[in-house]
Regions:
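Bacterial N-terminal signal peptides that target proteins for export
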Residues: 1-2
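Short, conserved catalytic or interaction motifs in soluble domains
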Residues: 15
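Ubiquitin-like/PB1-type beta-grasp interaction modules and other compact soluble beta-rich domains
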Residues: 18-201
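C-terminal motif of bacterial Sec signal peptides marking the signal peptidase cleavage site
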Residues: 9-12
Length: 201
């Protein structure tokens, strides 16, 4: 009887030692500082909306105007494609921008979702208190957004909202204050960067 128990324990231990261990998920960096006007990532895209983007016309009910916002929040977007972080360009959603020290300081009009620089920070400045999403931002930018194509980079797409993996419709990611959205096309890096928003944001 004792021999049978010992044999069973030994078998169980042996089985546990050969059981495959699931791969560990990526790590997330300590919060990295952001300075206004900084370029975060490789310059990959031209400034502003693409030819299929907003270009001043209303997009999904979002206007390019100069109305006073009653909602003002900030979201950070990181895009990593083919193993390299790509800069989200300056002046997305900005008509006739005036740029000083790599920062949009004035414009003919602003979409309610726009970028002032190439840090990856999306500014939500709207005259209405409502929820906006990532799909609307990409529509203003004029870039594709799907489970197999992000801003022209194709392949398997992995998404994180803050440090939690997101598996739903990418376009349906709702913007929340100081949220961090990471889109990865291809291999997920060992460490995913997270950022500290500037103190005055």
């Amino acid at each position: 009887m004792a021999l049978a128990i010992v044999t069973s324990i030994a078998f169980a231990c042996s089985s546990d030692s050969t059981r495959p261990v699931p791969p560990a998920g990526p790590k997330f960096s300590a919060l990295l500082p952001i300075e206004a006007g900084q370029v975060i990532g490789a310059a990959t895209y031209a400034a502003g909306d693409s030819s299929t983007g907003g270009q001043g016309a209303p997009v999904d009910g979002i206007a390019c105007d100069t109305t006073t916002p009653i909602q003002h929040i900030h979201v950070h977007l990181t895009l990593i494609a083919n193993g390299q972080q790509r800069a989200i360009p300056i002046a997305i959603g900005v008509g006739n921008p005036f740029i000083l020290q790599n920062f949009v300081v004035a414009a003919g009009c602003y979409y309610w979702l726009h970028t002032h620089d190439a840090t990856g920070i999306i500014h939500v400045e709207a005259p209405v208190a409502t929820t906006f999403n990532l799909g609307q931002f990409f529509a203003i930018w004029g870039q594709p957004l799907s489970s197999s194509n992000v801003a022209g980079f194709t392949g398997s797409v992995t998404a994180y909202v803050d440090s939690t993996q997101y598996t739903g419709d990418l376009g349906a990611i709702d913007f929340q204050e100081r949220q961090q959205i990471t889109l990865i096309v291809g291999t997920v890096p060992d460490t995913i960067p997270l950022y500290a928003f500037p103190a005055d944001y």
